[in-house]
Structures are given as C-alpha cells and as structure tokens.
Amino acid sequence: IACIDDYPGEVSANLLLDRIMGADVVLKKDDGRPEEVQYRELMDRLCKEYESVGEKVYQIPMGGSNLLGMCGYFECAQELTQQSRKNGLKAPKLVCAVGSLGTYMGLYCGLQEADSELCLTGIAISPFGEAKEQRLEEYYAQICSAIGMQKREKAAFHIETAYTRGGYNNPCREVRNAIYLMARQEGILLDPCYTGKAFAGLLDMISEGKIKKGETVIFLHTGGTPGLNTPCHRAEFESELRDGIQVLGERYEKLG
C-alpha cells in the first residue's frame, strides 16, 4: 500500500486493516508537488524494488480506478437496471460518491450499454477541476474501446461539485450529521470521507429542490466504514457523542 501522507500517529482505520491482512504500507511525506506526480514516482520505485527481488507486480491505482475496477461497476449498473425494471421503478435516480472517477465511469457506461432508465448523478467529495474532467473522457474512451461500446460524441456526465465541504477527507459537522441520520434511521454505517459526504450532498440536493418529493433515489454505498476510526474524524465523533455515555460507579453495581 503506497500513500502520499503523514503517519497519523497510530495504526488505526485503513492502516489497521492493511497490517492485519499482512500488507506492507509505505507513506511518503508530501513535498508540495502535484500528488499524482509524487504517487507515480513512488509506485514506480516500489514496483522496481519488488521486481528486482523476483516478485511479479500488479499495480492498482488509487481508488481502484483501472479498467478492471471500472468494469466491475459496469456490471453493477446492469444489475441495478435489471432490478429497477423488475420492481417497476419509474425514472429512478442513481447517486454515488465521486473520488477517483472509476465508480462513476463504470456505472455511466453500464447504464449506457443497458439503455437504462436510471439517471446517474455523482457527488464529488473533493475539488473537481479540468484534470478530472479530462480523465473522465479518457476513462470513457478506455471502457468503450475495451468492450466495443459506441462512444457518444457529447456524453452527458452529471457530477455535482458544490458539496466538497472544504476538501478531501475534511472533518465536517454536516457530514457527521448525515452519518448519524443514516445510522439511526436505517442501521447503515457511512464513512466521513466518501459515502457520508455524498449522502450529506444528497440531503442538500433534496432541501434545495434538485430532487423532488416523490422521486425514487438509489444511493449506492461504496464502502469505506473503517474511515470512521481515522484519528481526525474519531476525535470529532467523540466530542459530539461523549454526552451519551454513562459510567456507573462501584456502589451502583453492588446495589444491582
């Protein structure tokens, strides 16, 4: 596992799972250059190191956004289309978090190929600039070429960019409130970086009238719950939730 990041001071959240599974983790301190440049250099160096001792290396990019990962969500979109038709849903909206773009593009192409009635909306969880717009087009062409699908001249990508709330993985009260709502109403855990931020954006879209009362919405949960234990987020959760914890003393336990 290779990341451009500082050591958080403890083995927690994703780092804990990585190490439990036996993965090596390499963290490189940010040197101020574009993160993609640093990441590419780090991955190239690590691949050469492993190959030099006889290892065979398969490189998975950040977010799993390669052709194989995108094809997984291509199939997901087709399965959702089948389920939607089976249940007679009327023009349902499909909403997902958008980070490294692979999930969104796989879904987009899968819906196009299935001539689906689902309308896809992505909610960006980090600033969305020209580089990502260009990468969308590149991923679109890549999938179309790989599966032999007709590439549309003007693809209608719909990604909401107004709900990034200060940037990638930024602790935010509105996101935590969205996490509390989903957990307490549905018993489903969201994470503060991806699904929680996307769900908070979805709630804003409803309050702003972008999604109307009576419309059917499918919110796609893409995982990430270990992020609840990331130190910066856990500290905020603890400060907000501590008042609901009672510690009973020895006298009470004896009377009981």
Residue ranges and their predicted role:
Residues 20, 108-115, 201-210:
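Alpha-helix C-terminal capping segments
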Residues 4-87, 150, 155-173, 177-178:
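Small/polar-residue-rich loop-to-helix segments that shape phosphate-bearing ligand pockets
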Residues 51, 85, 112, 184, ...:
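Residue-level signal for alpha-helix termini/capping positions
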Residues 55-59, 97, 191:
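Short beta-strand-loop elements within alpha/beta enzyme cores
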Residues 2-4, 28-29, 60-63, 97-98, ...:
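Short beta-strand segments
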Residues 70-158, 220-256:
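Glycine-rich phosphate/pyrophosphate-binding loop at beta-loop-alpha junctions
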Residues 154-213:
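Active-site-adjacent helical/loop segments in soluble small-molecule enzymes
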